[in-house]
Design a protein with these regions (language model features):
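Non-catalytic cap/lid and distal C-terminal segments of serine-dependent acyl enzymes
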Residues: 2-191
């Protein structure tokens, strides 16, 4: 994402290797922010939609492990090693832990998370899937609100935070939010 792909895209698709955006949904939300922490010239815009923004905190490693297992039998420790190590990749890949660098980089950020309360966008959803989508979004909201508060306390002023009164862990909400974010993203990266 940060070396081979940008060079290939520039050579073959005329896509510049700097001043790009990273947008992540769900577990990829924290990754989009971390990409901008460590590669600020490449990713001047980062967005997390319903992301887990403090994955090294408390019980989040266990929840990430459960999610990864459900998504294909993967194990979180195989990704970032044991959480007990204070220098672990869990900390290096945690937006909350790295919030001061994100602020120092002046990355434009857009953070979205619903409350877990369904709306018309959930009409026709399967009951079991809806219950899981409600649970995940409600669970995730706390880290997003805490991230906003810590970002502002660290002096961050280049962010949009959208926490509407409803929204589940569902593509319909993310699609709507992407459309709302699009003008801001285009203005930032000049496309």
């Amino acid at each position: 994402l940060t070396q081979e792909l940008p060079a290939w895209l520039q050579a073959n698709r005329d896509v510049r290797p700097t001043n790009n955006a990273a947008v992540g949904l769900s577990m990829a939300g924290s990754a989009s922010l971390i990409l901008s922490v460590y590669h600020p010239n490449q990713f001047t815009y980062a967005s997390s939609m319903s992301g887990f923004l403090n994955p090294s905190e408390g019980w989040w490693p266990m929840l990430v492990n459960i999610s990864m297992g459900d998504a294909g039998g993967f194990k979180a420790n195989d990704m970032w090693g044991p959480t007990e190590d204070p220098n672990s990749a869990w900390k290096r890949n945690d937006p909350m832990v790295n919030i001061n660098q994100l602020v120092a980089n002046n990355t434009r950020i857009w953070i979205y998370c619903g409350t877990g309360t369904p709306s018309e966008l959930d009409a026709g959803a399967d009951g079991g899937n809806l219950m899981a989508a409600q649970f995940l979004e409600g669970l995730t909201l706390r880290t997003n609100v805490t991230f906003r508060d810590n970002y502002i306390a660290a002096g961050g002023t280049n962010g949009v935070f959208n926490f509407p009164d409803n929204g589940t862990h569902n593509w319909a909400y993310w699609g709507r939010e992407l459309q709302a974010m699009k003008p801001d993203l285009q203005a930032q990266i000049g496309r």
